[in-house]
């Protein structure tokens, strides 16, 4: 069996910087493009920094055509600052992190009320808002506690396109139905695992991420929604590489590295459930329609032949362990013929 995808997009990707960027950028290029997260150190907070980071990504891709949908880290922006960013062809939107909620988010928003002036400007200019929607409460309840904020944002800014990133709960799916200006991304890991897979037996640090994996009923609901072809649900890997020594330690970093295997694993999942025809919209069609995107043309063919995942990816002094490390997947990408 084969599945052919046109210009798949990853609507939530971490590429990091420096040597880590040089390692993971080509490994993320099975997709035709991606929304790139801005939580570097220091974060990407202006047009010049955004353009410079985009150019570093382009260099790291080594000539692979790749649509870079770049984001700014949310802060108070003036109209002039937003216009400068909007003038860049690679600018996509602004990512809001509650302060301290995830990797390199210490400079995130501490007072949601203070966001209103910038959000009004974004609404007027048609700039999408992307949100890591978690509170600082009990870890299993953080997304649920943030949902009322999503609701208020959707009501107060009805023309603002708001993306609830990496949703993990049935409750978030219910909220998605309430407001047409809400959309959402879902990760591979949250379609596959629950908290029990992370900590139910031996601790599995390479499955630990934020938002944390939830209960089986949540995973099943997310999968049903993805398989159904929901028009405002998109794939966003949240592929988040960390050096192996920062994952296999006390106080390990949060993040699952899935970029090199995401498309074959999704193909297997959708085919297994008789929904191969829904995969195109999940990994590209919905995003292109919602955001009027035109990624570089790329045709990817996947086939139900085995693919071995390495124990780690290493180069430039970096070593990153992926999800499914050392395992054999049932689907793989068909190599493109040279010439």
Where are these regions (language model features)?
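Histidine/acidic residue-rich metal-binding segments in metalloenzymes
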Residues: 80-96, 104-235
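Active-site microenvironment of metallo-dependent hydrolases
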Residues: 1, 267-339
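Short, acidic/polar
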Residues: 18-25, 77-88
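Divalent metal-dependent hydrolysis catalytic cores, especially in the metallo-beta-lactamase
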Residues: 9-11, 23-49, 63-75, 91-104, ...
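Short, electropositive alpha-helical surface patch
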Residues: 68, 142-159, 177-188, 241-260, ...
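His/Asp/Glu-enriched, well-ordered alpha-helical/loop segment
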Residues: 228-295
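Active-site-proximal loop/turn and secondary-structure-junction residues that shape catalytic pockets
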Residues: 15-17, 40-42, 74-76, 98-100, ...
């Amino acid at each position: 069996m084969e599945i052919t995808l046109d210009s798949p997009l990853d609507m939530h990707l971490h590429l990091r910087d420096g040597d880590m960027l040089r390692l993971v950028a080509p490994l993320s290029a099975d997709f035709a493009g991606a929304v790139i997260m801005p939580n570097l150190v220091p974060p990407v907070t202006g047009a010049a920094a955004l353009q410079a980071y985009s150019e570093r990504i382009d260099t790291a891709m080594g000539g692979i055509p790749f649509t870079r949908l770049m984001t700014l880290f949310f802060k108070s922006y003036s109209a002039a600052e937003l216009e400068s960013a909007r003038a860049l062809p690679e600018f996509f939107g602004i990512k809001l992190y509650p302060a301290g909620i995830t990797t390199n988010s210490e400079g995130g928003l501490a007072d949601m009320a203070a966001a209103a002036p910038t959000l009004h400007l974004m609404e007027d200019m048609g700039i999408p808002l992307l949100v890591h929607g978690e509170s600082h409460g009990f870890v299993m309840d953080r997304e649920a506690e943030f949902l009322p904020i999503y609701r208020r944002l959707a009501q107060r800014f009805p023309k603002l396109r708001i993306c609830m990133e990496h949703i993990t709960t049935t409750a978030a799916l219910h909220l998605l139905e309430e407001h047409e200006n809400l959309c959402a991304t879902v990760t591979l890991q949250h379609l596959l695992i629950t908290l029990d897979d992370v900590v139910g037996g031996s601790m599995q640090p390479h499955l630990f991420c934020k938002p944390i994996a939830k209960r089986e009923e949540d995973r099943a609901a997310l999968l049903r929604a993805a398989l159904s072809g929901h028009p405002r649900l998109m794939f966003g890997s949240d592929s988040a590489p960390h050096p192996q020594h920062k994952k296999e330690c006390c106080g390990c970093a949060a993040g699952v590295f899935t970029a090199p295997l995401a498309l074959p694993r999704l193909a297997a999942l959708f085919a297994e459930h008789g929904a191969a025809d829904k995969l195109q919209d999940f990994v590209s069609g919905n995003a292109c329609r919602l955001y009027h995107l035109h990624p570089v043309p790329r045709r990817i063919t996947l086939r139900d032949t085995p693919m071995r995942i390495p124990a780690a990816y290493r180069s430039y002094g970096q070593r990153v362990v992926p999800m499914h490390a050392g395992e054999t997947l049932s689907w793989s990408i068909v190599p493109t013929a040279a010439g």
